[in-house]
Amino acid sequence: MTTITTAAIIGAGLAGCECALRLARAGVRVTLFEMKPAAFSPAHSNPDLGELVCSNSLRSDDIASGVGLLKQEMRELGSIVMEAADATRVPAGKALAVDRDLFARHITAVIEAEPGITLERREVASLDDPALASADVVVVAAGPLASAGLSDSLAAMVGGQLYFYDAIAPIIAAESIDLSIAFSGSRYGEPGEEGDYLNCPMNRDEYDAFYEALLAAEKVPSRDFEKELHFEGCMPIEALAERGPRTLVFGPFKPVGFTDPRTGTRPYAIIQLRAENRNKTAFNIVGCQTKLKYAEQERVFRMIPGLAGAEFVRHGSVHRNTYVNAPRVLADDLSLRADKRVFLAGQITGVEGYVESAACGMWLGMVLAARIQGRELPTPPPQTALGALLMHLRTPVKNFQPSNANFGLMPELGLKVKKRERKPLYSARAREHFVRWLAEAGVTPVIEPLLPTAPDAADATGAIDTTGATGAAREETAPTEA
């Protein structure tokens, strides 16, 4: 039996809160360090815990998607982040979006009410901080925006660090949207049917003018000591546009499934606006994360039909993201190879996304809690969403890159299927493996596990090769809207 009576967790974001709650409920005395409100990163502004920065969407809630499947696994394992998300969700079609203020408030209330957690609101600028010395385990869950001091301390321990940029989409006031042009509706919805998004249609001339202005707009320059690398799922809109004039039309601006009520025809492009809160007083411009200068953002995005008078509640911005080369520096239990007392959790490990970060922190908490009970918790199989994500952190590659949950991380199906059948079969197989893992690992689900419901799932899963290597072809990692 491993002796873990005290733990110090640096960072009270999604991963840190998940891990802290697991350990506290296992009887560990947890000190949870959070530098807000004494200090804020360039992208944070809310003093509450679990603040969502890049978007208020946790992406698809459909279990026939990688992230939707991961959400279901987390719900069954008792995730506090999923509890908060389900309690504060706002309409967003097939996606799970939340009122981000209520979401953070929910998580903060749960953490503050947990008797086993002591919340210390101060910055930990070094892994040599005296407050960490007496802890049996130290968990670094500082997120993608770890402070300079902590980043330097971690870099010294792992031999270096990498940077890339996450870009934030602008948010505009609802009352400034011209509803004689923008219309409510979801992709493939019936004409006139109210949907979860507002949609701004563009004809060819309007799109071409917007595209040229976007390419010519002045951007915030990168610092000369930072290497710029973009993760596909949060790429700045201007960087995506540089790939070619039609990239946006086949990407975030794709018009498929929409009819412009003014013309009765499909527009050349569609820009979607997603509600930021339950009252729908503000909307973010979906897929338009950007590093344009503020004045340029106003000039360019007001070219979108319906947004000529847009009032910017928050401009888009860019922030640094820090992560380690997990296969090289982390052991399978997420401890540092250089110091087995120090563990990493969340986005700093190389998982990408809100849900994935929370899942990572949740899993680490489960692993350490099991050790207190004298057992090693087996990792879920790679056919599951959680197992595939953890396998990504363990698989050595020449150029390790962050990844979100997607079916491309899983072993191949091992049989030929039509494209439309592929995702339901991956999901059905994952459900079968996850339920079996729960029983074999002795993990009691918090809610009744959802069993496979795909047509012919029982026959298909029996024919699937479960020993295959990780598929080389990955599904697109960018969030699917509407």
Swiss-Prot record:
Binding-site residues, FAD: G11, A12, G13, L14, A15, G16
UniProt-listed Gene3D superfamilies: FAD/NAD(P)-binding domain
Cofactor: FAD
Record GO biological process: tRNA methylation; tRNA wobble uridine modification
Keywords: Cytoplasm, FAD, Flavoprotein, Methyltransferase, NAD, NADP, Transferase, tRNA processing
Localisation per UniProt entry: Cytoplasm
Catalytic reaction equation(s): uridine(54) in tRNA + (6R)-5,10-methylene-5,6,7,8-tetrahydrofolate + NADH + H(+) = 5-methyluridine(54) in tRNA + (6S)-5,6,7,8-tetrahydrofolate + NAD(+); uridine(54) in tRNA + (6R)-5,10-methylene-5,6,7,8-tetrahydrofolate + NADPH + H(+) = 5-methyluridine(54) in tRNA + (6S)-5,6,7,8-tetrahydrofolate + NADP(+)
SUPFAM superfamilies, alphabetized: FAD/NAD(P)-binding domain
A GO molecular function held by the record: tRNA (uracil(54)-C5)-methyltransferase activity, 5,10-methylenetetrahydrofolate-dependent
Task performed by this protein: Catalyzes the folate-dependent formation of 5-methyl-uridine at position 54 (M-5-U54) in all tRNAs.
NCBIfam families the record matches: gid_trmFO (TIGR00137), PRK05335.1 (NF003739)
Protein name: Methylenetetrahydrofolate--tRNA-(uracil-5-)-methyltransferase TrmFO
Gene giving rise to this polypeptide: trmFO
